[in-house]
Amino acid sequence: MIKSFFAALSFISRLPVPARLSQGLEIEQYQRSIVTFPLVGLLLGAIAGAVALLLQPWCGVPLAALFGVLALALLTGGFHLDGLADTCDGIFSARTRDRMLEIMRDSRLGTHGGLALIFVLVAKVLVVGELLLRDIHPIAALAAACAVGRGMAALLMYRHRYAREKGLGNLFIGKISLQQTLVTMAMAIALATALLGLQGLRAALITLVLIWGLGWALKRTLGGQTGDTLGAAIELGELLFLLALL
């Protein structure tokens, strides 16, 4: 379990992880690390929340919220944001399914991807700022949001097919079991409830339903999921959870 956690931490974040704790794992061990995704999110969100909390007395709510969101983006290396941008460039291109997938593989940022990044990042800054004004603890809110965002991404992995022939997403999509999916989501919901009580539970359940709907819509549009759509689900899951706290 410890090795799985550090494998997941090195896979979906930019935090330094000792090689002896994350390397030399079999493919199956990486796949089993899905159950630790909410714990990785918990850590990343707690760090970002701490940044916002520490800066608030010094620079005020708006800038504290901005730097908290910036910290989260830096901690992940923009990994999930890149997936969000690529997904939006593809699905809003109004092309054939194959062409959409081609566009998503293109590393260049398009108009729809740029707009998606602006909207999501601005929305996160605004909602984190509003939560600070409402005296909702930023460490608890961001830790829970990141845990739930990563936990609910399992909905796009279980019983979905990989829309391409190869890629990083193929490590998880269609490869995790029902038990792993349920454990991952249950852990995310439990963490949100422990941190924020019934408010966290309600927000987690709302996020679950909406991310399930997102997965269904992406499956209809693309014929399956990719690593990019997983990144999009994580980013949107975080935002939806934070909005549901308001």
From Swiss-Prot:
It is found in: Cell inner membrane. It is a multi-pass membrane protein. Keywords: Cell inner membrane, Cell membrane, Cobalamin biosynthesis, Magnesium, Membrane, Transferase, Transmembrane, Transmembrane helix. GO terms for cellular component: plasma membrane. Pathway: Cofactor biosynthesis; adenosylcobalamin biosynthesis; adenosylcobalamin from cob(II)yrinate a,c-diamide: step 7/7. GO terms for molecular function: adenosylcobinamide-GDP ribazoletransferase activity; cobalamin 5'-phosphate synthase activity. It is an enzyme of class 2 (transferase). The chain crosses the membrane at residues 34-54, 59-79, 113-133, 136-156, 181-201, 203-223. Its EC number is 2.7.8.26. Its cofactor is Mg(2+). The keyword ATP-binding does not apply. One of its GO terms (biological process) is cobalamin biosynthetic process. It catalyses: alpha-ribazole + adenosylcob(III)inamide-GDP = adenosylcob(III)alamin + GMP + H(+); alpha-ribazole 5'-phosphate + adenosylcob(III)inamide-GDP = adenosylcob(III)alamin 5'-phosphate + GMP + H(+). It comes from the Bacteria. Its main location: membrane. Belongs to the CobS family. NCBIfam families: cobS. Joins adenosylcobinamide-GDP and alpha-ribazole to generate adenosylcobalamin (Ado-cobalamin). Also synthesizes adenosylcobalamin 5'-phosphate from adenosylcobinamide-GDP and alpha-ribazole 5'-phosphate. HAMAP family: CobS. This is Adenosylcobinamide-GDP ribazoletransferase.
